[in-house]
């Protein structure tokens, strides 16, 4: 699949800062639900459909202090 966006937010319903394991579980669930393959290359990197992404875990802008998980395509 060709990625149209350089980054995307992964659904995360937790109220606490997402740990590495929570982030990886959320990304795995997102990929499975949307028909993508994923392979984790470390705590902060994931390969989705053969495209390398950086994993951001932190505040989601505009969410009134909620935490989020963002995958950003790496060059």
Predicted regions and their residues:
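Compositionally biased, intrinsically disordered low-complexity regions enriched
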Residues: 12-13, 42, 69-73
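Sterically constrained small-residue positions within well-ordered secondary structures
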Residues: 29, 39, 60-62
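Short, well-structured beta-strand/strand-turn elements
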Residues: 36-42
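Long, continuous compositionally biased terminal/linker segments
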Residues: 49-75
């Amino acid at each position: 699949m060709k990625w149209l966006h350089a980054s995307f937010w992964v659904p995360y319903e937790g109220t606490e800062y997402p740990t590495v394991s929570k982030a990886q579980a959320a990304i795995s669930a997102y990929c499975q639900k949307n028909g993508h393959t994923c392979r984790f290359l470390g705590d902060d990197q994931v390969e989705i459909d053969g495209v390398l992404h950086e994993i951001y875990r932190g505040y989601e802008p505009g969410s009134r202090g909620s935490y989020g998980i963002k995958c950003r395509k790496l060059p």
